[in-house]
Amino acid sequence: MANKKKPLKKQKIRNSEYYDMQLVLDELYAASVKGQRFCNLVELIKHPENIKLAYRNIRKNSGSRTACVDNKTISDLNKWNENALVAHVQRKLDWYIPNAVRRVEIPKDNGKTRPLGIPTIMDRLIQQCILQVLEPICEAKFFKRSNGFRPNHSAENAIAQAERMIQNVGCHYVIDIDIKSFFDNVNHGKLLKQMWTLGIRDKKLLSIISTMLKAEVAGIGFPEKGTPQGGIISPLLSNIVLNELDWWIVSQWEEMPTQRNYVHRIYANGTPDKSSTIRTLRNYTNLKECYVVRYADDFKIFCKKRSDAVKLFEATKQWLLERLGLETSPEKSKIVNLKRHYSEFLGFKLKVRTKGKKPDGQPRYVIEAHIKDKALLKIRKKSKEIIGQIRQTYDPGMEYRLIQTYNSYVMGVHNYYSIATHVNPDFHKIAFDVKKSLYNRLKHRLQKSGQITNRYIKEKYGTSREVRYLNGHAIVPIAYVQHRVPMDKKSRVNKYTPEGRAEIHKNLAGINMAVLYHLMNNPCGKQSVEYNDNRIALYVAQKGKCAVSGVELEANQVDCHHKKPLVLGGNDSYQNLIIVSDVVHILIHSSNERTIRKYLKVLNPDKKQLAKLNKLRVLAEMPELVF
């Protein structure tokens, strides 16, 4: 094997490469871009490598441990022989009949509940098999400003797009439309027709999806409409439904054909410069200038004129009802003048304010983004709840875990809401109440001095005078947060092209904050406080990468290994621990030849990686491996 350093990769992309599926998925994407039709997808879905990839992708997903009506979880699938599991999935797909779906009611902030439909673990595996094949086909057809439930898209991208429309384009009228119970009212027949239009012409696959949609809900019956939230494939199906809405709105302005075909130069970030086309549409047509930004079923339409917004508001409601059979909520749907009122979007509230004047003497408007009022109240309530839990325990281990839970929660909301322009004053509104709760409940145990062992907390919060310590553990100050500019997704980023994947890997140089929060919030219960603290410190020090393979790790793959095992006299010190992937950890300790061969094939180490692996095996008093 070559000694060339392997690039940093997202784990699902690596999984695809392990099972030789990435090239196939790339070809599906490229064919979909060209408008080709797909008539034999079931055979690809049933391919053994696709099934193995699906199993790996769901194996350590936190939801895989949730039981359904058959009381089975991923641990039951783990007992299957690999070939037997593949054969069983293939047989089920030959004549697919889904099991009943377990219905769970999740409480919402407004006091109501959101129904979740949880399929059995075997049905989830089959849905993952289908998702892997359908996703590249659909990704080629989806609109660029559709952000929810899509690879490499996020809420931050949606906020960045909305702010660009408001501040840069000057769209100060926003159409807010709320779809009544969207997920419960999706028309099954319409959805299947939309899939057919996207080029998915495999009738057997469409029949399987139709059967999935009509799966019995335990205790309720067989649904006639809707996509059950909780299913692996449901987010993709919901995007297929609303993709037609995206392109209908885009066709009203951005994609309106002109008599002259303009040649668009490409910006450095990969997006085309359409200024010539837009200028022509503004000067020579009476079309309504409008732009849509969507995140799942939450979408905004931005307009420059109120008269345009009024017409589009009525047209969109009518189109949703007649075309998709979806009703809108008259109480929540409205037109907002951003110069006077706020428009709420994804936990933020957006408005514009004047700041100086333009060269022509007209007022210059800039974005003003706050945390939504309900979100602030929720943050305050949750923070005080965790502080109350810390107050009620005097067990050092439990106290440490709760402090980590509090810190990860505060860091998480800081990270999400830091893109609000007024994030600092917003957090100061609740900081007094939270700090008062902290001092009143823990005043005799809090200290102002101490040492921060978590490197990330030290780098981000170490200069704050508001950091407090409880038995030597730092508590993150809730008001210590700064604004950062929201970033849109680069158009080149794409998990289904080699160039797009290279861009993804290039952007993964920092620490994955979601994984860090997970580690802080989920310490190893059977391990010491020292072990858990060093586990987090090592994850940060190693930049979230496996010490052997150099691969960035997902939360479910981070293993903290004792170089010298405890049974051989090792300890939980920083020097005796190292972060490795779950696959590497198995290879360090395994003595079973079959297991070793299996996971060496998965890891596929080069000479340097094998040398690192063998060094750890020697320290654990295991024989060296040959590959």
Regions from the language model: what does each represent?
Residues 85, 93, 100, 141-145, ...:
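Conserved polymerase palm-domain catalytic core
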Residues 528-559, 581-583:
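Short cysteine-rich loop/turn motifs with clustered Cys
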Residues 391, 398-461:
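Non-catalytic, peripheral interaction segments enriched in hydrophobic/basic residues
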Residues 567-575, 587-627:
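Polybasic, low-complexity binding patches
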Residues 178, 550-582, 590-596:
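Histidine-centered nuclease catalytic patch
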Residues 1-83:
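Non-catalytic, polymerase-adjacent accessory regions of viral genome-replication enzymes
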Residues 430-433, 440-526:
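Extended C-terminal regions of large enzymes
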Residues 214, 219, 324-395, 410-411:
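A conserved non-catalytic segment of reverse transcriptases
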